[in-house]
Amino acid sequence: KKAEKIWSFFVGESGLSLYFGQMHSHTAEYSDGAGTLEDAYEHAMQAKDVDFLIVTDHSNYFDTKSSATKTSYYDLSSLEKTADGTMTKWEEAKKTAEKYNAMSTDFIAAYGYEMTWSGGPGHTNTFNTYGTVSRNNGELNEKSNSYAGMHLYNDLMVNANKGLDVNGEAVAAGVKTKWL
C-alpha cells in the first residue's frame, strides 16, 4: 500500500523579534581590550544591523583588597575609585552605558563584567548586578556548588564564556552545566 501524506504548517504573528549584538567585549579603558567604553558604544551604534552591545570587562580590574567580603557586593565604596575619586570605576562604566541608552531608542548599551578567576577552568559573563564579585571573595566565590554565592542574587544573569569538557558540557569555574 502506498499513501501520499502532505505536511504543512502555518506561522502566525509571533510577536517576537530577533536582535543582533555582542555580549562579550572588552575595552582598554577598563580591561585588556582596545579603545574606550565610549568608543565601543559609538562604533556599535553606527554599525549596520547592530542592536545592542554589552561590554564585559574583566572583574579583576575592579578588585581591591577590601572587595573580598560579602558586603562589598552592596557597598560600592570598597571598589576601585576613578582618578578624581568621585565614583567607582564600576559606577562610571554603568553611567556611560546609561548615557548611550538615552541617546537612542534603536540601540541598547549595557555594562556587565567577565568574572575572571586566576587559574580557574573558565570565565563567565555576568549581567544585571548592582556591583561586582571579587575573585578573592570566598563567601560569594563558591565555584564548587553551582555558583552558590552568586545565586543569592535573583536578578543576575550569567553565561559561560570559556571551557567545554570532552562531552561538550560547559565547564565554567569548575561547575559543569548541561546545555538544554
Where in this protein do the model-derived segments appear?
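Extracytoplasmic/surface-exposed domains of secreted proteins
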Residues: 1-2
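Extracytoplasmic/periplasmic beta-strand context in beta-sandwich domains
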Residues: 5-7
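Extended, charged catalytic domains and RNA/DNA-binding interfaces, predominantly
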Residues: 10-180
